[in-house]
């Protein structure tokens, strides 16, 4: 079973895995990914808790089906729209506090992991651009340059 | 900016700072009331008007327990309200990165293009007439007014602190850490601040200047910067 790259359970998560459809709600994706980030393809169904207007509302059970290109195309369109309307990195509920160091690090890792996974599958790497835009917004340029050098040398401390 | 011998806050230019100024006024009133009461009681005591033969003081004990509790509640409630208000999530329109060095700031705007510049203090010998000594910089931060701005603050070498009193912002710049703060400017203007964490010989000479302008002027400025 192929392992989909980790995706962000933030408010607008792109799902780079083309084999997974979770209906229309991208917010539901967050809960599913939190439940089983590495085994999403085998998840039969999930209750999706979404936050609406400050209160947690249980949405209907979301049927997770393995679909092909139609869902992938819809997902790609979603991410393209999100990228077109990108202003700056949105609030990420995984990092709600003052310390955003991990936010920068995680998005940098996610981008490179996504690119690597997409290249391995021969799939379109456009959804990975979300992580790129976010880390570009948050990470200091000098940090990114240093990490890029480490990756080239093979001494990068993160797992990509 | 602050004028010489200024005692009070600078005019608030962000909603949070407005709240902080109001809270300070309120806290100062509470402090004035307590000090007046204490002074009054002290005077009475010195004039020997408070002597008593009683050994049972239940009533007065009750009063000077309940009254301070009420005072504390009067201080805590608005304080916590502002604390939570500061943490409210407001999706920012722009992310600005401020990196502290010895002894200047680097600012980066990388949401779209890679815009980056250094900001050094204007030396007094080069200061044009009418400009503010030790506060002016060669390149100011320009931001659109009335827009939520996220600032990510870090440092390259030692501890610094990015502070702009008129906006109610002060956040430490720590090497290896990204500290996030945010603000909205309620009006256009130029707001000054100074490094607020001792960082070596020229700690007093690395000021911060934020220029808040309408969006179209900000866009014009950023186009100039990127060209």
From Swiss-Prot, chain B:
Residues given in the record as Mg(2+) binding sites: 197
Mitochondrial matrix-side segments: 46-58
EC code: 7.1.1.9
Cofactor comment: Binds a dinuclear copper A center per subunit.
Top-tier EC class: translocase
A GO CC term attached to the entry: mitochondrion
Localization annotation: Mitochondrion inner membrane
Domain of life the protein comes from: Eukaryota
Catalytic activity: 4 Fe(II)-[cytochrome c] + O2 + 8 H(+)(in) = 4 Fe(III)-[cytochrome c] + 2 H2O + 4 H(+)(out)
Pfam families for this protein: COX2, COX2_TM
Cofactor(s) required for function per UniProt: Cu cation
PROSITE patterns assigned: COX2, COX2_CUA, COX2_TM
Membrane topology: Multi-pass membrane protein
Residues binding Cu cation A2: 195, 197, 199, 203
Residue stretches spanning the membrane: 15-45, 59-86
Mitochondrial intermembrane-facing ranges: 1-14, 87-227
Example of a GO biological process term: respiratory electron transport chain
Family classification: Belongs to the cytochrome c oxidase subunit 2 family.
NCBIfam families on file: CoxB
Function statement: Component of the cytochrome c oxidase, the last enzyme in the mitochondrial electron transport chain which drives oxidative phosphorylation. The respiratory chain contains 3 multisubunit complexes succinate dehydrogenase (complex II, CII), ubiquinol-cytochrome c oxidoreductase (cytochrome b-c1 complex, complex III, CIII) and cytochrome c oxidase (complex IV, CIV), that cooperate to transfer electrons derived from NADH and succinate to molecular oxygen, creating an electrochemical gradient over the inner membrane that drives transmembrane transport and the ATP synthase.
Protein's name according to its UniProt entry: Cytochrome c oxidase subunit 2
Organism: Gallus gallus
Name of the gene this protein is made from: MT-CO2
């Amino acid at each position: 079973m192929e392992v989909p790259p980790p995706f962000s359970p933030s408010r607008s998560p792109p799902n780079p895995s083309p084999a997974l459809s979770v209906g229309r709600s991208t917010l539901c994706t967050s809960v599913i990914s939190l439940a089983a980030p590495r085994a999403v393809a085998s998840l039969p169904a999930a209750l999706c808790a979404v936050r609406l207007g400050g209160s947690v509302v249980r949405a209907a059970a979301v049927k997770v089906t393995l679909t092909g290109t139609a869902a992938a195309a819809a997902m790609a369109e979603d991410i393209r729209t999100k990228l077109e309307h990108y202003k700056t990195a949105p609030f990420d509920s995984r990092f709600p506090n003052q310390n955003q160091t991990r936010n920068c690090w995680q998005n940098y890792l996610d981008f490179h992991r996504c690119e690597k996974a997409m290249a391995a599958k021969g799939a379109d790497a456009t959804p990975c651009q979300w992580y790129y835009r976010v880390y570009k917004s948050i990470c200091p340029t000098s940090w990114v340059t240093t990490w890029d050098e480490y990756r080239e040398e093979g001494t990068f401390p993160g797992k990509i | 900016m602050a004028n010489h011998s200024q005692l009070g806050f600078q005019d608030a230019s962000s909603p949070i700072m407005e709240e902080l100024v109001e809270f300070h006024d309120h806290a100062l009133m509470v402090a004035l009331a307590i000090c007046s009461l204490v002074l009054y009681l002290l005077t009475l005591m010195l004039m020997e008007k408070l002597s008593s033969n009683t050994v049972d003081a239940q009533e007065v004990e009750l009063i000077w327990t309940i009254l301070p509790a009420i005072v504390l509640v009067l201080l805590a409630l608005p304080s916590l309200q502002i604390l939570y208000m500061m943490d409210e999530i407001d999706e920012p329109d722009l992310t600005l990165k401020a990196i502290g060095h010895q002894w200047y700031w680097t600012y980066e705007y990388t949401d779209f293009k890679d815009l980056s510049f250094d900001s050094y203090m204007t030396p007094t010998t080069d200061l044009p007439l009418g400009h503010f000594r030790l506060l002016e910089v060669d390149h100011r931060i320009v931001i659109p007014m009335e827009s939520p701005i996220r600032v990510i603050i870090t440092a390259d070498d030692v501890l610094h602190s990015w502070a702009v009193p008129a906006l109610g912002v002060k956040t430490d710049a720590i090497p290896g850490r990204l500290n996030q703060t945010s603000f909205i400017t309620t009006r256009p203007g130029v707001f000054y601040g100074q490094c607020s964490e001792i960082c070596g010989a020229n700690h007093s000479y690395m000021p911060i200047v934020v220029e808040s302008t309408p969006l179209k002027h900000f866009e014009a400025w950023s186009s100039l910067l990127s060209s």
